[in-house]
Amino acid sequence: MVISTEVGALLLFLLVLTSLYFITNLKQRLSKAGIWSHGNEDPELSDEIYAKAALSVPPKRPGEKRIVWIMHSYVPNVLAGSEITAEDQIAFLKKKGWTIYVLVNRWVVPEHKGVQIFPIQKGRLGEAPDGIRKLFQSADIIAGQNYPITDLFLAVNEFSKPVVVFLHTQNDNRESLSFRLGSPTYVVYNVNFIKLEGTNAHPSIVVHPKVNTEKFKFDKENPKYVTLINCNENKGGLLLPQIAKALPEIQFLGIKGGYAKQNVKDEDKPVNLTYMDTQTDMVKIYKDTKVLIMPSKSETWGRTAVEAMASGTPVVVSKSPGLLECVGKAENSCDRSDLSCWVEKIEKLMTDDKAYHDASVLSKERIMELDREDEYERLDIFLTDIAKRHSV
């Protein structure tokens, strides 16, 4: 059977049209289920689903310790440092007997690792539906992270609950914490330098992000790459090809991040630079990495630095205060804009065996220090004391 060109073109057009309809319909269905997200846009949320949010939460049991944690975004759809840290802290606190509910603007899944997640509408927390309001009323503590501080307090002051603000970045509107905000206020800083920059008008604690380093403690066989993880502008994505061009004999690896625009133009990169897509398992990447670089403009800690140091990988960092606090005695740093410094330090580590050995030893010693810290235990004690102090 011979099909004419016109008929073939018509069939192809109908096939494409059907495919587009199916994809659009699928997006709509996934959106209504709360599991569709495109890029960095906030997922669509139907009024029907929002009205039912948290209505299924059971009444608080006698003796139950309950936290309602408000965030802009959460895992699994955003795998940035503060979201991963919150996931780790929540998992630890659950083991300590806390019940925790998460509220997010960017709602994608209704549950993650045993934690129920409910949607809130951006900028309209004060107009939350009945289920969310009852959840606030039942809480021992309301926590906030990466959420506008003033908006948070305006929305929850009526419930007279203690509010714990988790500060992870220098960009949070911290000036709001210089004043009395109505509800009893407490602050959890993720690094010392952010606390030192603030007014410390409220009781607070510093809790560094905790990384389970055991799976990253391994011996390497002939690692060859200088690696940058997350190629956005803030992390150093524009600087990476410049360094690679200056060191043509050394192999560089850029791992695409899971958020923000990635600077990974293949046509502009030197031949000794390889880009890879976002990775879910970083063990293989670290096994192939001889030196990790972190030329970040702003970084309050450095989860990837900790993961890399666990295997003795030297890490060259910018002079961002959070990174310097993170690497501690293993510091190997450059001003972010000083290209010659990055080139010099990388070349020395990649070609001088003694320099590499000494830096590797310091990385492992720093991990021993971090592994000894019991900061999540202190967080549990801090929160338990707050709940007891304000119990009715």
What kind of feature is each model-predicted range?
Residues G144-I149, L167:
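Short His-centered aromatic/hydrophobic patch
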Residues P184-K217, N234:
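Donor nucleotide-sugar binding/catalytic pocket of nucleotide-sugar-dependent glycosyltransferases
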Residues T213-K269, Y275:
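Conserved catalytic-core segment of nucleotide-activated headgroup transferases in glycan assembly
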Residues C231, E331-L339, K348-D353:
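Conserved acidic donor-binding segment of nucleotide-sugar-dependent glycosyltransferases
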Residues T278-Q279, K284-T289:
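Short alpha-helical donor nucleotide-sugar binding micro-motif in glycosyltransferases
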Residues K297:
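Aromatic "clamp/platform" in nucleotide-sugar-dependent glycosyltransferases that forms part
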Residues P314-V317:
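Short hydrophobic beta-strand element within catalytic cores of glycosyltransferases
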Residues K354-T384:
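A charged, aromatic-enriched C-terminal amphipathic alpha-helix characteristic of glycosyltransferases
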